[in-house]
Amino acid sequence: MAFYGSLLPIHYQPIDWVDSFRKWNQIPWYQLGIERRADWVANALVMIPSAFFLTGAAYLCYPSWPIRLLLSGVVGAGLMILVPVIEFVQLWFPPRTVSQNDVLAGWIGVVLGIGMWWVFGHRLIRSFERFRSTSDLERQIGWLVGAICLGTIAYSLFPFDLVTNRQEFHEKIRLGRLDWRFFPKSFASFFTKEGPLLSLMKLLPFGVFLGLRSSKALHLVWLLAIPFLIELSQIPIYSKYARLSDVFAGCVGAFLGWWLTKSRERWIPWVDRWWFWRGGWM
């Protein structure tokens, strides 16, 4: 996956080996402007799953802690070697940018992936075991929706290209990525990939998640707060749109999800089907 993600779009161009080594010896170190920052972060993110799951495989196969630590080091060393190899192969795929920055980003991703397993891996295993062992359908739905909520938060922050100075922030405003209007500019923009309809759909799982919890007045506060906090978190991310109309649409989606859970006696029997769970995990 790391190789495939690092070579997209696949556009092979043959290069002589002598030229490839000459270019490799001259790969630059770039000053990371806002245009390159998202690509740099992506190079780190693409290595995290490989490091995370390979460390997890070693963790599960060997019960001895010293061996687990040793194999984590082996995984880290192997992926650290793989990162510059991938960067070297990118010389044959000219749409890809080859730089020392990307090598550093890949190494950071390896360290983060291994560290994330050691911090969260055991909890993830226990949660998955509880999910499989329980026969409580509502609890299973709650875990599935909770995972969707975490994915939504990650999507809302991706590609993590934070603005670092006032000029970049003004450029984001100039591009129309901050909008304080209560309604979208046009009806057509409501259905775009960055429009309010997407915000409504993104926040619907949060309403379902809160609705499945015990009924508390505080949950209603969270239904209003979560859409606002998500949009607020997107303000310092250069490529993300933060709009008041999305806050309103998100609140509608959250309350819609909450309302669906309050009438779940009508639809929850349909959820207890094999095709629902297969589709949910896909």
Predicted ranges, named:
Residues 1-282:
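Bulky hydrophobic segments
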